[in-house]
């Protein structure tokens, strides 16, 4: 009983501490969306340049998650994560202090690589701390760090802009805060129950941590990931999930100002509402997966993507003169739905690949997700320039439906890849 109590206490501490650190990864990459309108107004960068920068950043981030997924399965997750957030802090500070367009691109692309050092170690550590039967619920709770990080970025940057500090401070202040969080990460996050000094988690059909490190080869890890049909399907679906998600998140304040005539500060608050609804949607999706679908997250994702398409279509159809509260509700509905699949894909991948290859599986699904920035970045910029924001918003609904169809193809898959 005492051992179980000690484990639960250490588990809770790990979930909270790692979630706090990951929220600051989000702070140091989603701050750009609030700085964009100011940068465009000053003329230091163009819409196409921002779109291109977002696309390249996303691709580099996806590659980083994929490559670092291999390393994170082998190295200490706490140290790996600490180095990542420290380097991201540095890139933000450098970005805020430059005025050259080429350096904007260089620092933000490098930030994309350092950002990819955040989730792979978390995916690995979470599977060592949480039993597969609880993973959907508890990892969904952990996954709200994405939304809280985005809310922190939007709220903090809205405040900095409101008091007249200018867009540069949207990078300098988050960079300084992230540097402090790197110290917190090194001392407070624990890689595994063994590092925290508590009993190791036992999983039926799984291996002890020491045994896993000693016996699982690179080829076996690759087989667990690339030989699994479900992982391929959810990776492809993730491409479309992220188009919709980043379409709203990266361009939200900009299209609200240009398409709906809503000031940047109010647009930032509306995007915060989008993220807060995402927190509830993420937790609800995890609970539904464990309680209703017995761990089969792809079934939850099917319904989430269907309703995400409906809310995206509704936002496009809403007249320009409609009250702000109607636009806010539709944004919140889209956020509630789209973040469920975003969280569950990582959980499904970890369960399907087992804890022996969880980081590699999440690296693979991650790179597929962030290849979507070719569409959500420069693609959206192209559609907006030639056809207007209405066409761009309508396309989000179409992409959501394509993602839903891919999840449907995995409807009958088992909940995990562990051998019974």
Locate each region found by the language model.
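Extracytoplasmic gate region of multi-pass secondary transporters
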Residues: 32-36, 228-283, 342, 376-377
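Conserved MFS/SLC helix-loop-helix module at the cytosolic interface between two early adjacent transmembrane helices
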Residues: 63-102
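C-terminal ends and interior cores of transmembrane alpha-helices
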Residues: 86-99, 306-320
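Helix-loop-helix hairpin linking two adjacent transmembrane segments in secondary transporters
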Residues: 142-193
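Cytoplasmic helix-loop-helix junction between adjacent transmembrane helices
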Residues: 107-148
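Cytoplasmic membrane-interface "Motif A"-like loop-to-helix N-cap segments
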Residues: 74-85, 291-305
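Helix-to-loop junctions at the C-terminal end of transmembrane segments
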Residues: 65-76, 283-294, 384
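Residue-level signature of mid-helix packing/kink "hotspots" within the transmembrane helices
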Residues: 30, 58-66, 150-151, 275-283, ...
